[in-house]
């Protein structure tokens, strides 16, 4: 292979890898309720900036994603994924629950 062609091939491969990494970083943070537990139980999110949070209900019954501290409350039907628009949060920890099922362990957003 000729050197200029090899350099072009390497440059294109590097650009594709960088673009793929950038897309992964652009994906909104996501939590999932499955088997009566939130996954992950703790999620780090950006502080002092608004963002979208994806909430997926993989259980057989409707849930109510609720955070009293953040004034967010949304019903999520079985098998549904919703987007919750989150406010800019000061650094700290913020709890969320499934208000329909109080026995479900709470989850935590950690704003950093």
Locate each region found by the language model.
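Bacterial N-terminal signal peptides
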Residues: 7-17
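Histidine- and aromatic-enriched segments that form or immediately flank copper-ligand environments
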Residues: 58-78, 107
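Sec/Tat signal peptide C-region and signal peptidase I cleavage site
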Residues: 18-24
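Extracellular/periplasmic metallocenter environments
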Residues: 25-30, 77-112
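Positively charged n-region of N-terminal signal peptides that target proteins for export
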Residues: 1-7
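N-terminal edge beta-strand
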Residues: 25-48
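Beta-strand cores of secreted/periplasmic/IMS beta-sandwich domains, seen most often
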Residues: 41-61, 81-89, 94-95, 111
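N-terminal post-signal-peptidase region of extra-cytosolic proteins
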Residues: 34-41, 67-71, 79-83
